[in-house]
């Protein structure tokens, strides 16, 4: 099942952009996805490959998230980064609701999520409060999503339960995050890169 989902993921979003003629297909096998998931890593988001399709690049990633913190539990304290560039709202709008966990907005990268294991609550919409810009030389900017803003999600967001087989399309500029993950959720993310900001020809080290 996973092999078929990976193949389908590579074909998603192609109708959105005009393509230059390509002379070969790119494959990502189910075994390669598992290799990346099993490789030691301090992050949950792993780009598998970035493919140049002429007018744009297409990135395919796999993400495995563990349990989210319990409702009402305090988020772990982080030391402030004096070099960090702020983004998003600076004050909570009157009457706005607040998501229990943080989220992110990508400047120019759409995402299509395809859940392959587990379940959780996907939150989309709203705005980022007291956010931080991804650094120009960070993995988020160069390999994962391009320039982004992460922080607390507030405002008129939508929360829905997603499970194996569910697909969600998240446009660039739309805040998104997760909550209520009891054990884990694993999903593929297909990311068109119209500005070609991601590392050209990137292949995850675990499958080189």
Whereabouts are the PLM-identified features?
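His/acidic/aromatic-lined binding-pocket segments of jelly-roll/cupin-type domains
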Residues: 102-105, 111-114, 159-160, 167-168
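Bacterial N-terminal signal peptides
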Residues: 7-16
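Bacterial N-terminal signal peptides that target proteins for export
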Residues: 1-6
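A short, N-terminal "cap"/entry segment at the start of jelly-roll beta-barrel domains
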Residues: 19-105, 200-208
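Short, conserved beta-strand element in jelly-roll/cupin
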Residues: 106-126, 137-150
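Short alpha-helix capping/helix-loop boundary micro-motifs
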Residues: 153-157
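Conserved metal-binding segment of the jelly-roll/cupin
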Residues: 161-181
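A short hydrophobic beta-strand segment most commonly corresponding to one strand
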Residues: 183-201
